[in-house]
């Protein structure tokens, strides 16, 4: 059975952040199946439960919705507009379990990798 979870993503090591940055990332409330994979059917059933919070330097810089778009793409929409603020890179294939890495692509095409810092059922 799919449950909703709070998933914390923190910026992983990259140029300019050789140790990563736990104060830069996303808090996501998302439906995960028993294997830790995103469940699009569960999100379509309860879309109001899919939330995203973007933080930088520990401060909230945006909040919005987790959505599944055309072709199954996972979208982080921080301003409730039509355009994605970030797209999950192959999120449908990823497992959201602590210690795993996932990538997000910004509208500019810039891509960043995040570590799944924690996953807690809500």
Language-model segments: residues:
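Short beta-strand/loop turn elements enriched in aromatics
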Residues: 47-87
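N-terminal intrinsically disordered, low-complexity, charge/repeat-rich segments that act as generic
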Residues: 1-44, 56
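Short, compact, well-ordered microdomains
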Residues: 77-122
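A short, compositionally biased
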Residues: 3-5, 69-72, 96-100
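Short beta-strand micro-motifs in enzyme catalytic cores
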Residues: 5-7, 74, 112
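Residues in well-ordered beta-strands of folded domains
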Residues: 10, 29, 67, 77, ...
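Intrinsically disordered, low-complexity boundary segments flanking structured domains
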Residues: 12-18, 52-53, 61-63, 102
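Well-ordered beta-strand positions in beta-sheet-rich domains
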Residues: 25-29, 63, 88, 113
